[in-house]
Amino acid sequence: MLIHATRRKVTALVASIAATMLAAITMVAGPAVPSAQAQNGNMVIFGDSWVADPPLEQWAAGKLGLDARGSSNVTTWCPTSNNNFGKVAARQLGLAAHDYSCTGTVTISQGPKLASQVNRAIDSRGLNHDTRRVLISVGFNDTYNNDGRPHADVRRDFVNYMRPQVDRIRAHAPNARIQFVGYPQISDGRGNVCLFHVGPNMHDVTPLAKITEWENLGQWMLVDAARATGTQFVDLKPATRNNHMCAPDHLRMWPGVVDFYAGGGNMPFHFTQRGHNYVGGIVARS
């Protein structure tokens, strides 16, 4: 993903940190977006780094303990973008955004757990009777962390993890519509990625079938969770099939590791702001 003014300074760093920051990555028709004053209440947002997508300098300050709030941690606070797709959707719906998403979040792997985000939302009363929407987008980090396990087992374990979390959310936000938001298209769908965009519409094409495998697995994990919990799945794949990391500059929403042509964004190898704005509209209309 792109970075703003600091991107040229961190280009050399991007390749080494991209895999660890890969936190990754559907469209449901719905009513027209109401005006900002049409609804009262809030939206609660849970997810990994593709949701949180904090500015790189804020992410680094949190990791290094240089923020006034101290070191970031999924149990206390996490830096997030003011313009990620969840907040974009909340603004379009006239809802206050309570964003608990955090980079690196996992469910069935070792690491910062989604349950900790739910704990924070309950403890801070972000989840309440006035909550109208709850967005959940997580799971990609669990795909590569469970690489080699049968996909059916990973999907089963993910559903078993998510069921009690959804039950907790429902108990504290009984009036909310809960939505599992799928990941957008990352690879070209044929097992290729484009990591280095070195000139206008000039890039490599690198076979990396694992990315396609992982994004497809993450998609089905979220579909399964929505079905098992009686919640809604928002499918972003159809709406972003032409916006993957090998797409032309004017369409690309998932940038390469080095990419100065897809448009502005925050974290390397994560969604562009254009992508957040686009997906935010889809979620708001869903």
Predicted regions mapped to residue ranges:
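Secretory targeting and sorting signals
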Residues: 1-37
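Short amphipathic alpha-helices and their capping/turn segments at secondary-structure boundaries
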Residues: 33-45, 114-130, 163-175, 284
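Short glycine-rich His-centered loop
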Residues: 39-80
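Conserved SGNH/GDSL esterase-like catalytic core that processes O-acyl groups on lipids
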Residues: 63-153
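Conserved N-terminal glycine/acidic-rich loop preference
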Residues: 126-147, 153-170, 179, 184-233
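Catalytic His-Asp segment of secreted/periplasmic serine-dependent ester chemistry enzymes
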Residues: 186-286
